[in-house]
Amino acid sequence: MTPSRRIGFISTRFAGTDGVSLETAKWTTILERLDHKCFYFCGQCDRPEEVSYVVPEAFYRHPEIDVINKVAYQGTWGSLHEGRTLHPETHELHQDFFSVFLRPATITKRIHELRFYLKEELYKFAHKFKLEALIIENASTIPLNIPLGLAITEFIAETGFPVIAHHHDFAWERQRFMNNSVRDYIAMAFPPSLPSIRHVVLNSIQAHDIASRAGVTSMIIPNVMDFDSPPPPLDDYALSARADLGLTPEQKLILQPTRIIQRKGIEHAIELTRRLGIPAELVISHAAGDEGTDYEKRIHEFASFLNVEVNFEAAIVGDARGVTPEGRKIYTLGDVYPQADLVTYPSTIEGFGNAFLEAIYYKRPLVVNNYSIYEADIKPKGFKVVEFDGYISERTLEETRFVLNNPELTAEESEHNYELAKRYYSFTMLEKRLAVLLADCFGEMA
């Protein structure tokens, strides 16, 4: 039995239903099972106050970080004028900027001021909670808060803290980061290469990329769910969900359980719903989040163009049950998933695929786009789902109709999928790998 450790999680936020926050909660569950104590450093937090250390500037959408990112990744005069309008107090930061590849000295100065401030806060965090190890959740992976990433790198270099860097989304995986004026910072800190860091990635492609690009080895730990504890049966509260989501008794509930962002490929779900030719309604469970509303407008227009009934139900699908200000019942995804006739997952890019595992956990039939990680890591396991390659074909429609019209066979395949996921993506697997990582961090036997 390894001794209890005090472990600090660091990220830009631990709140809501984004993938990083969800996976952090799962890691915390396992670590606490192993008798470790967990604490949180971030810019936004919904964890208990007594274990949290919140620094607003650590959030990647803090106004000052927003201004830095506009200069770093959106170096056009249009973006600069927009930045002046949104943040007039930072007008001086933009005066000498003329190319996305050149960084104004004023921006460099402000990055380092924030880096120093955030590093001091990291020291306070470590001392306040008497931390023994750190787990960095994506803050040293995707360069959305450059000062925080630099602060983390310097803190580790100065202290030699045992660190697990849990990577979700690398800069090289996102087009928006290709042209920038912060290549020196990305090379230094996203990800950093330091001897006390153990790197963890979600999939085999990332493991290959981080080795070739950063020269570091990594352990693969995919997303997980608690497949050792099957979902409970529906209770009376959940039974009204279909009606509250606007479905009539004869309609099929097609669930798109993701945020409304472009890489989720929601147009494919709308097209599928239209071309199936059956009474059906597409329910999108999450809002656009903090990545803008342009794509959401596009989805509204596309659904209207194809005359598809789409319900945008983020208002009544949340983290916990409750009531909206208007008096509507709020349901969890656990209330909605078991009542879905079909789950769509048409993403074009994913680090792994939380929604895929959720659909398997709730034993729902699933339509999946062959995104790269699915093709490389998930598909070879032998899951039985409807697949398509970038567009909805007649074969996709035929297979989907067959799934909907043959519930007994679908139930058998769902059980098969559940058992596969239990083998490869369970909390038991996560517990074993975290035990190995922590033992390595502290020089112990796993």
Residue ranges, per PLM feature:
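Short hydrophobic beta-strand element within catalytic cores of glycosyltransferases
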Residues: P365-N369, V385-V386
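Conserved donor-binding/catalytic core segment of Leloir-type glycosyltransferases
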Residues: L239-A243, L247-K264, I270-T273, V283-I284
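Aromatic "clamp/platform" in nucleotide-sugar-dependent glycosyltransferases that forms part
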Residues: T348
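Nucleotide-activated donor-binding/catalytic signature segment of Leloir-type glycosyltransferases, i.e.
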Residues: T248, T293-D335
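A charged, aromatic-enriched C-terminal amphipathic alpha-helix characteristic of glycosyltransferases
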Residues: N405-A439
